[in-house]
Amino acid sequence: MANIHIVIPARLKSTRLPNKMLADIAGKPMIQRVYEQVTKSKFDSIIIATDSQKIKDIAKSFGAKVVLTRDDHQSGTDRIAEAVTKLGFADEDIVVNVQGDEPLIPIENIEQAAQLLIDKSEAVVSTLCEKITDVEDIYNPNNVKVVFDKNNYALYFSRASIPFERGFSEKEQINISEFFRHIGIYAYRVAFLKHYAELTVSPIEKYEALEQLKVLYNGYKIAIEQSAKSTPAGVDTLQDLEKVRKLFNV
């Protein structure tokens, strides 16, 4: 039986909120909050993959297993792929990518992503989404939208509003069609991760700045379904950080 692992990619030099992995949340760095949240799951191992000696030292201090990776990776998936190779995981194993800036991610969603990949044998990656209910979220490029087929395989991810119903105003769109926000959690087959770095980088991946488009561009399938629980947005800005701090201080 395949083992299931959680890997948390943690980059120190984030662009929008520098050093956010070490940002204080109710007396603990954010990376520790994320780690403590995922330890509530029952997977085989939990690893932090980072390019920072500082993050590694802090993570070791609270008992985490850490893999130090290169600092030139273009995405969290690239970082995880290196970590998986170093750790020697078996090809049949599954790795769940939990973002290091999501301290409030529901455990149910982590487990759901892993189970979805187990159930969808044609997919090499699985992920989750949730229905958009606020029209402003449709047009916010920070909210990645996704469309998928009747068998729950992703067709496309975009920062633009997809789908678009021609002939209706922006405000009317949400009443005409369903829109889904992509939730940035992924489960991967280890065999796929081991050759991920060899895949062709696609123009659309660069245009949209969405790493998952590399998977689709190279002809692989991504399974997707609506999340069991609503997932709070990750911490990308100072405003996001303040919201999370308030929730932990309640």
From Swiss-Prot:
Keywords of the record: Cytoplasm, Lipopolysaccharide biosynthesis, Nucleotidyltransferase, Transferase
Main location, first listed in the record: cytoplasm
Pathway assigned in UniProt: Nucleotide-sugar biosynthesis; CMP-3-deoxy-D-manno-octulosonate biosynthesis; CMP-3-deoxy-D-manno-octulosonate from 3-deoxy-D-manno-octulosonate and CTP: step 1/1; Bacterial outer membrane biogenesis; lipopolysaccharide biosynthesis
Annotated localization: Cytoplasm
GO terms for biological process, alphabetical: CMP-keto-3-deoxy-D-manno-octulosonic acid biosynthetic process; lipopolysaccharide biosynthetic process
Keyword Nucleus attached: no
Pfam families noted in UniProt: CTP_transf_3
CDD domains: CMP-KDO-Synthetase
Gene3D superfamilies: Spore Coat Polysaccharide Biosynthesis Protein SpsA, Chain A
Assigned EC number: 2.7.7.38
GO cellular component, one term: cytosol
Biological role: Activates KDO (a required 8-carbon sugar) for incorporation into bacterial lipopolysaccharide in Gram-negative bacteria.
NCBIfam families, per the entry: kdsB, PRK05450.1-3, PRK05450.1-5, PRK13368.1
HAMAP family the UniProt entry points to: KdsB
Family, similarity comment: Belongs to the KdsB family.
Identification of the protein by name: 3-deoxy-manno-octulosonate cytidylyltransferase
Species annotation: Francisella tularensis subsp. tularensis (strain SCHU S4 / Schu 4)
UniProt lineage: Bacteria, Pseudomonadati, Pseudomonadota, Gammaproteobacteria, Thiotrichales
